[in-house]
């Protein structure tokens, strides 16, 4: 799924209900990129990444501040949360003008806030982002694919977006 040029999201909660089948070398991901800005300065919102047979999912933000400058702990830019490996799980991010809050199965995993800093590019997330749902096979983070584990799928049940009403 690739919504660039079709649907972009800002100021709301996006939820994806998906079952992540396991295989060595499988790297399913649900993530977002800015509609009109370049990476990494425009940011990246990783709503879910799972590696191989893990029983956790990774949630991360990337930006010039976290990726290029390597500042990942002030504020913390990543977390993990437990998943049910053989069931559907709900992955979510709430997008606010001054923070991103991440959830797995309605359990809050972490919040990435806008902070005061002299460094550039700390919070580029107050802009429209498009959604990507994909399955990569192999890579530096997951290692080589084991052919005997294939085929492998990510089954998506639904995607919901809840737009916050603007204050008048």
For each predicted feature, which ranges?
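GH16 jelly-roll
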Residues: 1-168
């Amino acid at each position: 799924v690739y919504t660039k040029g079709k649907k972009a999201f800002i100021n709301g909660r996006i939820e994806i209900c998906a079952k992540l089948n396991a295989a060595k070398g499988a790297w399913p991901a649900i993530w977002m990129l800015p509609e009109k800005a370049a990476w990494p300065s425009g940011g990246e919102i990783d709503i879910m990444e799972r590696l191989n047979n893990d029983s956790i999912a990774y949630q991360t933000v990337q930006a010039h501040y976290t990726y290029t400058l390597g500042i990942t702990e002030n504020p913390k830019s990543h977390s993990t949360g437990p998943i049910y490996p053989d069931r559907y799980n709900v992955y979510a991010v709430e997008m606010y003008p001054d923070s991103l809050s991440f959830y797995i199965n309605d359990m809050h995993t972490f919040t990435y806030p806008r902070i005061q800093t002299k460094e550039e590019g700390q919070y580029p997330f107050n802009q429209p982002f498009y959604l990507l749902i994909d399955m990569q096979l192999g890579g530096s983070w997951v290692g080589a694919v084991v052919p005997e584990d294939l085929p492998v799928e990510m089954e998506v049940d639904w995607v919901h977006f809840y737009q916050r009403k603007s204050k008048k």
